[in-house]
Swiss-Prot record:
Residues 29-52, 432-475, 668-697, 734-768, 781-886 are annotated as: Disordered. Residues 671-684 have a biased composition (Polar residues). It comes from Drosophila melanogaster (Fruit fly). GO terms for cellular component: axon; cell surface; cytoneme; membrane; plasma membrane. This is Interference hedgehog. The chain crosses the membrane at residues 710-730. It is a single-pass type I membrane protein.
Amino acid sequence: MTLLTSSLLLFSLLTSRLEAIPVLEKSPAHPAHSAHPAHPAHPAHPAHPSPGVRILRAPESLVAPLGDEVVLECETSLQPERFEWSHRSSRSPGAGFKYLKTGTAKANVSQEAAISRLRVLVRPDTLGEYRCVGWFGPLVVTSTIARLELASTSLVDAQESESPLQWRVSAGNSVLWSCGQQVQSNPSASWSYYRNGVEIKPEFIGTNGNLFLSNVSSESSGSYSCQATNPASGERIQLPGSLQLQVTPEQRSESKSPHLLRGQPSSQEITIREGSSLLLLCPGVGSPPPTVVWSSPDVVGAVKNKRSKVFGHALEISNTRVNDAGTYICFQDNGVRPALEHYIKVHVEQPPQIVRPPWADLTNEGDRLKLECKATGVPTPEIYWLLNGHSSIDDSEAELSNNFLILHSVLKRHAGYVQCFARNRLGEHSAGTLLQVNPKQIQEPRESGGTHRPKPNQGSRQKQMYPPTPPNVTRLSDESVMLRWMVPRNDGLPIVIFKVQYRMVGKRKNWQTTNDNIPYGKPKWNSELGKSFTASVTDLKPQHTYRFRILAVYSNNDNKESNTSAKFYLQPGAALDPMPVPELLEIEEYSETAVVLHWSLASDADEHLITGYYAYYRPSSSAGEYFKATIEGAHARSFKIAPLETATMYEFKLQSFSAASASEFSALKQGRTQRPKTSTTEEPTLQMGDRDTTTPSHNETFNMSPMLTGTIGGGAVLILLLISTCFCVCRRRNSRSRGNNPNKPRMAELRDDFVPLGNCSPTKQRQRTRHIHITLNPLAQQQQQALEEKNDTDQDAPYYQRPSSYDYDPTLRRMSSSSLRRSQRTLERAGGSNGSNNGNNNNLNQSAEAGSIENPGKPGRVLMKRPRLSSRSENLSSGSLNSVGV
């Protein structure tokens, strides 16, 4: 990657909040030849959630002899774009680190995937401190320091120890000889002990040059010597001093109080590393041999605990802790006064450990930023900072104050990875955070002069199109990733939709655009920083590197692209450690449009691997796509999701994520929003000039109480019944009005007059149904035959009408329609007779005679029409009817 490309990428960092990237402490390396670790590595304790880009194995400090070749190894969680190594010579400890040129005679760098190896020839100019630097796009991650030291062994004050020691003790005593006090070795020497020139096995290991003989006897008498060996160089040193020990029988010895022998220390001071085993040895002899009691005024329960063991003159404490530091007293008493007290001062050193890592949010350019880094360790660790691999001491805007880094004015060049290092003589520990810088918006320059006056026909200045931030990429599966981006707060043109574009890194690789339109949603900001969005991209190829960008489409149908993301290498899932899976505990009904998710992690889950969580939700009745929400921070255990539909059941699932991968989904869990609450509070009356601008939501518009619904339904039924009643009454009145027409044909009259009213009457009266039985007169058949013959010869005969006389029965209510039709035909036939019917029907005869007189010139065709009856109950007992029975 060229310097220009690196600079451009530095201004377009990942925008979603990435938590600190802990640099794990050193794990055992594979030194070449006789190289040995200078200090054992302390356990790794990641101090903060990691986005997946971190140092898995930092180079380890080594001690090697001159002319040897050593190998420093560095491994990262993801394959970087490139590795670099820097060096600071031990000849100039105050100087800064310088990047090494690879391929030289004294340093050779090789890379295999995510592992880089530096081969160094041990020379005086190659001794010093080394760092491994991994480049991940705009991010620069630096490892902790590895020291390369020269193996050495030397004697101190050798002349004073040339004369041999001569001790005479009674049998049964324990003897402590410190033969290695004059030796200085790097690394610590290993010891061998000899009696009369024959090597003997010591009772305790790790005595650091102290020979301890317990319960001596006459067989223990002899000449003792010791030898130190450097484990790195193999160099051996035979100490000139020796011990002549003479053991006498206890019966021949006179009584003596406990006392120290010549050359034995009156007090001791021991320094040990936390986690190691501590062995305290008590010097002193007496006659008879004294009894030893151990105690400590500083450490409560120092002797009587599971980690402590007493072996007479020896006290062993395993897995030493910091609170084990203090003064220990060895009290010796044999009944002869005075008793002997021996004091041993114990110091427990602790490697540095960062307990409060730095944390940086999105910071505006020009703002003041204060980062804190708190660490523990014995001795108290020194804190220093790196900004994208460069020391903060060289930055003019940076100030160091105790555990704080203060940037008085955040600039674009500060964007990147900020690391805090805690250092003491036992080693280093590191943690970092991603510093995101929101650049200042460049305003269009105005014309110089006084008040700006718009030119004629010049419209208002168009709003700017503010692009979204570069997306942050998280692996979801072997073929898909999740993108997160943000639209910073602005007053520019509103965004309508987003499109996601991606391309595979390589020559002649074009940008691909996904088919999905990602809506902007409601025009409001989710937080003070802006509004965040997420989208997934599928159908990718594993073990390939991609870049992503976001295309924003604005309300003026124009579009603008975000800066491209950093290179993202899509690793297969088999190469990644599984992420902790969250467990959904409860879906709390928060309000009518919101719920709160509550979840937990397993007790053995490593929370430091998590950057945040993805929440997926959709209505339970839907089989469509899930809505997504991003929850930042590994410590989050609850999250409110809104807005949702009122009184609707939803299903939810969670997964944790980091920049490298995402976990499996949690089990589905259902929950619902609250039902609407009925309120009896009266709405305030709007005054003149006031207007209620509240717009009800979709759910509130159609949400009615059951009582109101029943009232409206009952009213609708009553209205329908009233309309039906009115319709029947009107129809009855129309039937009556049609019956009063004198010119209406007789067939229609009879139908209308005898239409039953029982079907449409609102109130039905219970009355006995009256049946009318009509029997035709035999004379009517003869009259009908004569009438038909006349009709054939005379088609134009006029009609004459004479009122007919009927008996009226006011109690008659109903009549059979079929009987009425037969009666009608009978009456019409009877009207055509000649009137000589022997007086059976006087009314008909009168009508016929009247008709002949009024029209003498016409043939005698007479049709009798009955006038309108005054009631629906009639007694047809005259004319051509023979009998009427009711």
